[in-house]
Amino acid sequence: HCDGVNLTCEACQEPGGLVVPPTDAPVSSTTPYVEDTPEPPLHNFYCSKLLDLVFLLDGSYRLSEAEFEVLKAFVVGTMERLHISQKRIRVAVVEYHDGSHAYLELRARKRPSELRRIASQIKYVGSQLASTSEVLKYTLFQIFGKIDRPEASRVILLLTASQEPQRMARYFTRYLQGFKKKKVILIPVGIGPHANLKQIRLIEKQAPENKAFLLSGVDELEQRRDEIINYLCDLAPEAPAPSKPPQVAHITVSPGISGVSSPGPKRKSLVLDVVFVLEASDEVGEANFNKSKEFLEEVIQRMDVSPAGTHIAVLQYSYTVNVEYTFKEAQSKEDVLRHVREIRYQGGNRTNTGQALQYLSEHSFSPSQGDREQAPNLVYMVTGNPASDEIRRLPGDIQVVPIGVGSRANLQELERISRPITPIFIQDFE
């Protein structure tokens, strides 16, 4: 069609007059991974239902680049609180402006940490417009064109901060009707003073589940995140019970969220062999080391530590590696916590991270130290300084989650250690 001086070609129309948009493939290829090797939840509060969830991100200039970074952080933080799997929650992420750019597709068989990494690297566009109609058309035909998981709920989280020109919105209502026919729930999140309230109200009128969240700006996203997750999680059905005993010990209900009457998402207790590694160098100091211990206690309190559930081992390291607790010792929460409280700071003038990782690879995760062959191997490493020695690649069956603390933590080094899992960075030991 002709729009002013611009001639635009479109794909042929589907029955009913709707135009099928061209396919825009995700930015990254889909690398398979083993679904049965779990990545542990990063937060106590998270959702584990049958859900296909699509994030639509406004890429217009109405959000500054800094504000768009906050928007991305909200998406990544939400993903951290979802049980992402082809068997549970699948996610797609699309940035929209005058067109639509898919960064993640529902069928992407990647580790959750890799999906979050891709989402965190979405480029800021800052275009003059962001067409809600175009991205809804894209989602209707390209993402939900074929319903391959009818047992799962289908939800779109529309993160919008701008208004499209009226000429682009002529089929807006028709797309909404298409979603209703396919039983797709559309949750608009209006951000800031320029969000299109008229379109948001139209979305709400289509179905009672299409609840809108109106925010004064991106700074409210984090405050409302758990409320939004809780709402969309309640829209989805429970996953069916497994036909044979899985690696999950049991399911417990997490604490409810204040101000929300419906039950919250659920938390799994995984069967894991977990080694906690704490830096205890002179650079860290005794006071900060003790804060690392307090953090360790809080994490263990939330775990299902038991003979049949999660097993814990603890190391501290600096110039040398000190073994504080092994998998062979009593695996009850009370015993582990008592020993953690008794750990004494060792100090040392080096940060031999490579030596610590080599030790746990060769010794901690060995049958002689109580490692279980059927349990996934996970490492949480708290460090605040660059390694003093060489770090060698660990076997593929050991997943390391580094927690870098303070300005001296080496980003590139920790990313190499953790790949494909994204390291966690915090400002200080407080």
UniProtKB/Swiss-Prot annotation:
GO biological process: activation of blood coagulation via clotting cascade; blood coagulation; cell adhesion; cell-substrate adhesion; cellular response to cold; cellular response to lipopolysaccharide; extracellular matrix organization; hemostasis
PROSITE patterns: VWFA
Modification after translation: N- and O-glycosylated.
Predominant location category: secreted
Glycosylation, residue list: 6, 23, 30-31, 252, 261, 290, 349
Gene Ontology molecular function: collagen binding; identical protein binding; immunoglobulin binding; integrin binding; protease binding; protein-folding chaperone binding
Tissue specificity annotation: Plasma.
Keywords assigned by UniProt, alphabetized: Blood coagulation, Cell adhesion, Disulfide bond, Extracellular matrix, Glycoprotein, Hemostasis, Repeat, Secreted
Location in or out of the cell: Secreted; Secreted, Extracellular space, Extracellular matrix
Pfam families named in the record: VWA, VWA_N2
Tree of life domain: Eukaryota
Disulphide connectivity of cysteines: 9-12, 47-233
Limits of the VWFA domain: 52-228, 273-430
Complex and partners: Multimeric. Interacts with F8.
Job of this protein: Important in the maintenance of hemostasis, it promotes adhesion of platelets to the sites of vascular injury by forming a molecular bridge between sub-endothelial collagen matrix and platelet-surface receptor complex GPIb-IX-V. Also acts as a chaperone for coagulation factor VIII, delivering it to the site of injury, stabilizing its heterodimeric structure and protecting it from premature clearance from plasma.
UniProt protein name: von Willebrand factor
Organism listed in the record: Rattus norvegicus (Rat)
Gene: Vwf
